[in-house]
Amino acid sequence: NEIQTFLVSQIEYYTKEAESYKEMAKEYNIDDGSVHDTAFGIIVGCIYSSFLQIFTNQNSVPNSQDIEEFTEIIIKNSKKIKESIIT
């Protein structure tokens, strides 16, 4: 599936660049305890933005099945994303 392939490639990119997003999260947090959560949110937000951009480029909007697929892929890869932030 085209969307799944795209999302997996985005997850790969953002996990490789996780250190940059962790640094960005540090800039937004006074409390060091929430840096990892903030970085996770930034990364998932970037992936979601890219996901929506696919539809915008096609003059379309995601339907509930597309959103469900996005959510499932993020959940399935959340451990990988979190580990990339921690290491």
Task: List each model region and its residues.
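Short terminal alpha-helical segments
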Residues: N1-K26
